[in-house]
Design a protein with these regions (language model features):
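Acidic/His metal-coordination segments adjacent to aromatic residues that form catalytic metal sites
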Residues: 2-15, 81-107, 157-158, 172-195
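Alpha-helical scaffold segments that form or flank carboxylate-/histidine-based iron centers
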Residues: 12-17, 38-57, 103, 128-140
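Amphipathic, well-ordered alpha-helical segments in soluble domains
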Residues: 23-31, 57, 61, 110-117, ...
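Helix-loop segments that flank and shape redox-cofactor active sites
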Residues: 27-49, 114-129
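Conserved alpha-helical segments that form or flank metal/cofactor-binding pockets of metalloenzymes
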Residues: 51-81, 147-151
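Internal, conserved structured core segments that host functional sites
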Residues: 92-146
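A contiguous pocket-lining binding segment that forms or flanks enzyme active sites
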Residues: 128-191
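Extended, helix-rich structural scaffolds rather than catalytic motifs
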Residues: 163-258
Length: 258
């Protein structure tokens, strides 16, 4: 019999921390799917390293969420023993890898946000979150540089690479707005100086994205309509497939030891 999902006491700080941890875990898992399949060996290593950076961020955030919650949940339980509706990650990060251009555009959109986010979170009044932010910002800065180089290389490359990258931008753009939204519980943490106002990051994010997209001879969509729902547990079918693979061992053999 499969292991049942855990119950989580979602106080504002626990929920806020889990949302960021879920972003990192899900996107890190997506990048791990490229292992052995990247277009060149060097990029195979780069994608794996970025995935490991994100996994490290997820572990620290899950551990802190468990400490704050105080009900015995830890990083493994949060990762392996929650169902789809309990995950609160952005819809952007759960989107399938698609081709290499699609993966790079998704990573670029997220990394450009994460770099600004972690830089701002270094000023959080929560000492644990500010410490996690200091480490994560250094990693995110590298991710932005790496992805920016690929955006320009692909966009200003061959006719096919340009077309594939533009298609990826068009497909993923509607998932970017969710990064800058907040609910009442998050706004309360902003007021307390624990969280940061994500909406205030959008102008800086848009400048970074617009500059790189322009340099890559690509274009951003004109639509303002955005997808949302991930932060409240309403996900695409893609996350269910991802979690089925990610959680299969622990769900089938709970507490297994090697």
């Amino acid at each position: 019999m499969a292991t049942p999902s855990i119950k989580v006491v979602e106080t504002p700080l626990v929920l806020y921390t889990l949302r960021r941890a879920d972003d990192a875990l899900v996107l890190g898992h997506r990048l791990s799917e490229w292992c052995g399949h990247a277009p060149m060996l060097e990029e195979d290593m780069a994608l794996a390293n970025m995935g490991l950076d994100l996994l490290g961020q997820a572990r620290e955030l899950y551990s802190y969420a468990g400490k704050v919650e105080g009900s015995g949940n830890d990083e493994d339980k949060f990762a392996y023993l929650r169902d789809v509706r309990q995950y609160r990650n952005l819809l952007l990060v759960e989107q399938p890898n698609g081709d290499f251009a699609h993966t790079m555009v998704r990573q670029f959109f997220y990394a450009a946000f994460a770099d600004l986010y972690w830089r701002a979170m270094m000023k959080s009044k929560d000492s644990t979150l500010s410490a996690i932010a200091a480490k994560s910002e250094k990693e995110s800065a590298y991710h932005v540089r790496h992805c920016s180089e690929w955006m320009v290389r692909l966009g200003d490359g061959t006719e096919e690479s340009h077309a594939r990258t533009q298609t990826a931008i068009d497909d993923l753009w509607a998932f970017t707005g969710e990064m800058f939204e907040a609910d009442n519980s998050e706004r309360a943490l902003v007021g307390a100086g624990i969280a940061i106002d994500a909406a205030a990051l959008r102008p800086g994010w848009l400048r970074t994205v617009s500059d790189i997209v322009s340099e890559a001879t690509l274009a951003l969509p004109g639509s303002d309509w955005m997808q949302r729902g991930g932060r409240s547990g309403r996900h695409s079918e893609h996350l269910g497939h991802l979690l089925s693979e990610l959680q299969s061992m622990q769900r089938t053999f709970p507490g297994v030891r090697w």
